[in-house]
Amino acid sequence: MSKKQVFQFLDAPREMPRKLPLALRTAGDWNELYGAFAQPEASHQAGRCLDCGNPYCEAKCPVHNYIPNWLQLVQEGRILEAAALCHETNPLPEMCGRVCPQDRLCEGACTLNDDFGAVTIGAVEKYIVDTAFAQGWRPDLSKVVATGKHVAVIGAGPAGLACADRLVRSGIAVTVFDRYEQIGGLMQFGIPSFKLDKAVIATRREVLEGMGVVFKLGVEIG
């Protein structure tokens, strides 16, 4: 790695995506506060990563995301590979990129945090998955072997959706039941739209259904 790459953080300050104008945020259902990175911005911010030998960001992450690895892929413009890597450890990375408390977890543990500003890990994670989905990327299940087993998951909140994702990847058919007509649980009904746009949840439903997950909504069990 060249000296310029190693010390890129000196020339590239921490920057978040642009905060959207108030008029745009309040139009309709209170849109998300921040816009999205464009590819050059995401690559620039991802390139600030020092690729630490002992990545504290990864250790501090509750699911131990391969953060330096997918930051490197973003810097190189390999977004679809980055999306696949994100999903190896996290069934809902686009949600975590928006609502996870990065300041107390991965970004708080970033080596650059105290003196130079942490790498914008959450915003880059959001960029990866949103961009990959927009480009038509979907989880590759071509090597999954059906087991013939079928599991019912009660509740279409974050835990239920994550469980369904992992079961399908293991070759197990899944039907998810929920008393409400929409999936998401707390993400749908507890987190306001200015933090998590509900269209993001709708996209995740489309992805899960494409993986073979069946939703039975408006059904109360027990």
Go through each PLM region and give its residues:
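Beta1-alpha1 glycine-rich phosphate/pyrophosphate-binding loop at the start
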Residues: L10-G35, H64-E76, L85-H87, D114, ...
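Ferredoxin-type iron-sulfur electron-transfer modules and their immediate structural context
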Residues: M1-H150
